[in-house]
């Protein structure tokens, strides 16, 4: 299998992982773990405070809650990293900072909006988070930086 076919397969498989991770019903949080700053409209759930994890850090009541918040942010940074990294190898026209940031942001916004639609129709217990937009976009940007670093040494 040549490199382009392998990259395409990787993109398809990782996209399926994103679908499973982001668009399936989310279980309730473990007992004692709550996210500060949550707002609800009907069964739609929003976290619209930018940098919510930092602003509401004083409301964290346990080490488990603190770990959960850190883990959630770290996973959001990593969510689009592999996908964007593979796109960079496959699509030369994407290899500009503005394009990477725009694609990462639009993918993240699409994920968040799709979660809202799924919650509206099927009550999947998902949350539209402003912080997901910037953390996912940061992950795409970090993929771009790694790509540039790897190609600088060639």
Predicted segments with their positions:
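Bulky hydrophobic segments
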Residues: 1-125, 141-154
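Non-cytosolic membrane-interface motifs at loop->transmembrane helix junctions
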Residues: 124-133
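Alpha-helical transmembrane segments of polytopic membrane proteins
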Residues: 72-74, 132-136
